[in-house]
């Protein structure tokens, strides 16, 4: 005997009841074990959606709609602060002579991705740096220029 010859023991299985196949079948005819009338006696009467309120006007249709959500269209930036650039200079990870680009920041782990990097002005910068990024806050722009560095906005 092998797996291809296995079958259930005699009498171990039964065929399912066939509903709605006439009075003589014992499970058919008038209402086919569904009771009388009502939603659950109709065909296609499965579970209703969780927001279904029994025919009452649903909540999302009753409350007023107003406002606007710009989330699908907003521009998300990976951010880096000026103090982080200064710390990298202090730790001699960055070189003052090399330009700081989004790719350099991504390689150093300052930002996760080199796409859309914005430099913010938290902290202080004491060394002149050539910084290239997709956007700068006004305070970051001022601090980089005060330290003798340059700011370049790169395109996508």
UniProtKB/Swiss-Prot annotation:
Extract the Pfam families matched here: Ribosomal_L27A
GO terms classed as biological process: translation
> What domain of life is recorded for the organism?
Bacteria
Which stretches of sequence are listed as region Disordered?
1-56
What does it do?
Binds to the 23S rRNA.
> Which family, according to the similarity comment?
Belongs to the universal ribosomal protein uL15 family.
- Oligomeric state and partners? Part of the 50S ribosomal subunit.
Q: What is this protein called?
A: Large ribosomal subunit protein uL15
Organism, by scientific name, is: Salinibacter ruber (strain DSM 13855 / M31)
